[in-house]
Curated annotation (Swiss-Prot):
Region (Disordered): 256-414
Gene field: USP20
Biased composition (Basic and acidic residues): 258-278, 315-331
Source organism (scientific name): Pongo abelii
Superkingdom, taxonomy of origin: Eukaryota
Single biological process term from Gene Ontology: protein K48-linked deubiquitination
The keyword Nucleotide-binding is assigned to this record: no
One GO cellular component term noted in the UniProt record for this chain: endoplasmic reticulum
Protein name as it appears in the record: Ubiquitin carboxyl-terminal hydrolase 20
Length: 913
């Protein structure tokens, strides 16, 4: 449908058409037979006012078109166009939108034309209200179903829930130029196309997500076939792949920013507290040497109130965010992924953690994602807090059968919080890796990533180990009656429980199920609450997840200081809140012989979910309340069932049920009574809306300025959708030297927009960050480095091919060297240009085995490759490392006349490098 709009050559015959004219004609009658609407057709030929009836009557519109040779006509009910000559549907939306385009780009009129082909700044002005009112007359966007491809309801429900997360959807709609990848299967492109179809003004009733379904099956074979899968597993796999395809390295620009800001001391004093405590400096006093600025930095600590948020709305004809401004929807700043860190707590120092609060810090950029589904870096020490009793971090590994509806949650007993004191934290360095670890970020990590501080204390020596772990979702246990009683007595004895309903959601599984469900609800409503037990709320599940655990018995803590198993205690708190909080309720249990589903109703708030009780004192997030965006529900048993999603439309604020290709409006009470499985919450902030309106007012002033400022388009998208967008991050289109990386220059217009001086100064004073950019140029330093890197790669790969060719031609080599294939694959990716980072020193430790005599031999079954001595010498001279593992071949001399043929002996020896 999208391709046909450029193929019709008859659009030039259309006269001046406005929507008001079409609406006026729709209230008339057929000029031939006098019949009234609906489904009248208006001729679009220049100076032709004819209105005729359609095929449901005498079809005078077709007769008129054939007689007069007027090819184009428009349906006055649906506003769809038909070309009789092309015999297909065409589109008029570009002509209808023409009056709107001039009002949305004021910078083209008031600023000199740019020398570089950059897009105008997407700032709304006062007269955009008219375009919004015209948009409101159209059908709400986003209400598009998805066809079931065969037990694919788990995918459809997950995609609908993600589609109704405005920060993510707005990125794919407004920042399409940033969706670039050379990684297969290019799932981000398929998702972008799907989102564009779902949110198009001329949306179909449903779409068929074939391309995305095919791509996810290539990524994870578990989703191949037509078996029912877990929607949570699909969400993780999809977002992992989107991150991998869209991730970009974080540019270390501390020195650059300091150099640019050194001449503005007054501004520096105003924003002295702009940098929020990072996890590096929160855990360390001397970790600033290897830190770069990232999205996560920046808080207005210089003022008494929290840092305010601003909005620059995008073009009114496309932006979802303008609708959000009218409805006062609230958003927040999704902070970034960080590595796990270990903290050692000495028993002979202070007995509180107050010292942690006083650590000066600056924000830390996100770290690389793990390739595992949970995407949490594995700690190298005992500070990893995932035990068999209850995971104290958001990491949980699914082990259920692939054909079941969900994966099994681990047993989650809720324990009383023991009384104990924590010691002052001191950092243990994680140990330098041989290869420099590159930090990455993406729109996925910006929106969905939060972090948790997990601590384990030895009750004998009081040593405390801490781990900072990144989470994408929180998998919460559903507490039973006994656990709920302990929680309420120990934690919520002074906090009244929020009211909620006890009824489960209506499961559309036939009349029998409906009747049974109706009777059950009636019985529940007539029975005292003490009979069924207390209402389980989402806050109870959060309290159960964050409750302290005692480590004793079979689950004792291995203390590094005591060198023994000791009784301990562990707990966790949220260190950084995400923009979108994804909550997964553990409704499925898979035991050895059977599986079952927990059908307990969990009451969850539609607005005002407050996470303050679960925050660490060192939490950097200012906004702690969330509003519900969408909820995925599962109807059925552990072995089979059906997924649907309830989502709030961001344009009109109404709730809708998405059941494959069927979309139905529902009341919010239906959502409250739903049996939630996966919930998406979004930060709320009224202050953000007011600040956005202030920026719109500044933009409408149209003050003439001599300087134009370039700002990151991606950061402006955060303005549109985040409550806490953080400091301006122009590093996303700059290199570490302050110029444009050569590989980005050809699409720089997709990365930046132009701001007038008054808007830039306001944003810069409020949010900090930067750096200020008035001129775009290709970085000559990066160009030289790229050329040198290309030359190095070419020399290394040519030399290897030459040496390996000679090795293959050698019939009986006297010595063969072994090299780890893991390291070799990293080197191969580097020389082929797939990875910009060199592999680091050769690491043969994985394929080496130490014998009792101290000699190192080749490990049996090791993943290794064979190279010549010359090749080993060449690679070792470039990268170093080891140990050296050589397989020597020698022919033994015959010991007697019976030994006629000589015996070949293969001796593996290793020489430490």
């Amino acid at each position: 449908m999208g391709d046909s709009r450029d193929l019709c050559p008859h659009l030039d015959s259309i006269g001046e058409v406005t929507k008001e004219d079409l609406l006026l004609k729709s209230m008339g009658t057929c000029q031939s037979c006098g019949v009234t609407g609906p489904n009248l057709w208006a001729c679009l030929q220049v100076a032709c006012p004819y209105v005729g009836c359609g095929e449901s009557f005498a079809d005078h519109s077709t007769i008129h078109a054939q007689a007069k040779k007027h090819n184009l006509t428009v349906n006055l009910t649906t506003f769809r166009l038909w070309c009789y000559a092309c015999e297909k549907e065409v589109f008029l939306e570009q002509r209808l939108a023409a009056p709107l385009l001039g009002s949305s780009k004021f910078s083209e009129q008031d600023s000199p034309p740019p020398s570089h082909p950059l897009k105008a700044v997407p700032i709304a002005v006062a007269d955009e209200g008219e375009s919004e009112s015209e948009d409101d007359d159209l059908k709400p966007r986003g209400l598009t179903g998805m066809k079931n491809l065969g037990n694919s309801c788990y995918m459809n429900a997950a995609l609908q829930a993600l589609s109704n997360c405005p920060p993510l959807t707005q990125f794919f709609l407004e920042c399409g130029g940033l969706v670039r990848t050379d990684k297969k299967p290019a799932l981000c492109k398929s998702y972008q196309k799907l989102v564009s179809e779902v949110w198009h003004k001329k949306r179909p009733s449903y779409v068929v997500p074939t391309s995305l379904s095919h791509g996810i099956k290539l990524v994870n074979p578990m989703f191949r076939g037509y078996a029912q899968q877990d929607t949570q597993e699909f969400l993780r796999c999809l977002m992992d792949q989107l991150h991998e395809e869209l991730k970009e390295p974080v540019v270390a620009t501390v020195a650059l920013t300091e150099a640019r800001d050194s001449d503005s001391s007054d501004t520096d004093e105003k924003r002295e507290g702009d940098r929020s405590p990072s996890e590096d400096e929160f855990l360390s006093c001397d970790s600033s040497s290897d830190r770069g600025e990232g999205d996560g930095q920046g808080r207005g600590g210089g003022s008494s109130q929290a840092e305010t948020e601003l909005l620059i709305p995008d073009e009114a004809s496309r932006a979802i965010s303008e609708k959000e401004r009218m409805k006062d929807r609230k958003f927040s700043w999704g902070q970034q992924r960080t590595n796990s860190e270990q903290v050692d707590e000495d028993a002979d120092v202070d007995t509180t953690m107050a010292a942690l609060d006083d650590q000066p810090a600056e924000a830390q950029p996100p770290s690389p994602r793990s390739s595992s589904p949970c995407r949490t870096p594995e700690p190298d020490n005992d500070a990893h807090l995932c035990s068999s009793s209850r995971p104290c971090s958001p990491v949980h590994h699914h082990e259920g059968h692939a054909k079941l509806s969900s994966s099994p949650p681990r047993a989650s007993p809720v324990r009383m919080a023991p009384s104990y004191v924590l010691k002052k934290a001191q950092v243990l360095s994680a140990g330098s890796r041989r290869r420099k670890e590159q930090r990455y970020r993406s729109v996925i990590s910006d929106i969905f990533d939060g972090s948790i501080l997990s601590l384990v204390q030895c009750l004998t020596c009081d040593r405390v180990s801490a781990t900072v772990e990144t989470f994408q979702d929180l998998s919460l246990p559903i507490p039973g009656k006994e656990d709920l009683a302990k929680l309420h007595s120990a934690i919520y004895q002074n906090v009244p429980a929020k009211p909620g309903t006890c009824g489960d959601s209506y499961a559309a599984q036939g009349w029998l199920a409906f009747i049974v469900e109706y009777i059950r609800r009636f019985v529940v409503s007539c029975t005292p609450s003490w009979f069924w037990g207390p209402v389980v709320t989402l806050e109870d599940c959060l309290a159960a997840f964050f409750a302290a655990d005692e480590l004793k018995g079979d689950n004792m803590y291995s203390c590094e200081r005591c060198k023994k198993l000791r009784n301990g205690v562990k707990y966790c708190k949220v260190l950084r809140l995400p923009e979108i909080l994804c909550i997964h309720l553990k409704r499925f249990r898979h035991e050895v012989m059977y599986s079952f589903k927990i059908n307990s109703h969990v009451s969850f708030p539609l607005e005002g979910l407050d996470l303050r009780p679960f925050l660490a004192k060192e939490c950097t997030s200012q906004i702690t309340t969330y509003d519900l965006l969408s909820v995925i529900c599962h109807h059925g048993t552990a072995g089979s069932g059906h997924y649907i999603a309830y989502c709030q439309n961001v344009i009109n604020g109404q709730w809708y049920e998405f059941d494959d290709q069927y979309v139905t409006e529902v009341h919010e009470t239906v959502v409250q009574n739903a049996e939630g499985y996966v919930l998406f919450y979004r930060k709320s902030s009224e202050e953000a809306v007011r600040e956005r309106q202030q920026v719109v007012s500044l933009a409408a002033m149209r003050e003439p300025s001599l300087l134009r400022f370039y700002v990151s388009r991606e950061w402006l998208n955060k303005f549109n959708t985040f409550a806490e967008p953080g400091p301006i991050t122009n590093q996303t289109f700059l290199c570490s030297h302050g110029g444009i990386p050569p590989h980005k220059y050809h699409y720089i217009d997709d990365l930046v927009v132009i701001l007038p001086q008054n808007v830039w100064e306001h944003l810069y004073n409020r949010f900090g960050g930067g750096p200020a950019v008035n001129h775009l140029y290709v970085c000559s330093i990066c160009q030289v480095e790229i050329e040198a890197l290309a030359k190095r790669r070419r020399i290394e790969i040519d030399t290897f091919i030459k040496l390996n060719k000679a090795f293959q031609a050698e019939e009986s080599p006297g010595i063969i060297y072994c090299i780890s294939m893991q390291w070799f694959r990293e080197w191969e990716a580097f020389v082929k240009g797939k990875d910009n980072e060199p592999p680091g020193p050769i690491d043969n430790s994985r394929i080496a085995q130490v014998k009792g005599s101290g000699h190192v031999q080749l490990k049996q079954g090791a993943d290794y490759g064979q190279i010549s001595e010359e090749t080993w010498t060449y690679l070792n001279s470039l990268y170093g490392g080891g140990p050296e593992i050589a397989i020597r071949q020698s022919v033994a001399q015959p010991l007697g006349p019976e030994s006629l043929h000589g015996e070949q002996k293969i001796e593996a020896e290793a020489r430490a490098v």
